[in-house]
């Protein structure tokens, strides 16, 4: 899980999700692409 000020989709399988007011990127194909805005 990377914590970044600016989260971006890294590959075409990445999805932007807002959970509890926090923007996250989840990726089912490459778990290393997980990010959270912080």
From Swiss-Prot:
| GO terms for biological process, alphabetical | translation
Q: Which Cys-Cys disulphide bridges does the record give?
A: none
Swiss-Prot/TrEMBL keywords: Ribonucleoprotein, Ribosomal protein
Q: Name one GO cellular component term.
A: cytoplasm
Q: Which SUPFAM superfamilies match?
A: Ribosomal protein L36
Query: Keyword Cytoplasm on this protein?
Result: no
What's the protein called, per UniProt? Large ribosomal subunit protein bL36
Q: Which PROSITE patterns match?
A: RIBOSOMAL_L36
Q: To which protein family does this belong?
A: Belongs to the bacterial ribosomal protein bL36 family.
What GO annotations for molecular function exist for this entry? structural constituent of ribosome
């Amino acid at each position: 899980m990377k914590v970044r000020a600016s989260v971006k989709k890294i590959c075409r399988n990445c999805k932007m999700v807002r959970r509890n007011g926090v923007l996250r990127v989840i990726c089912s194909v490459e778990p290393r692409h997980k990010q959270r805005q912080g």
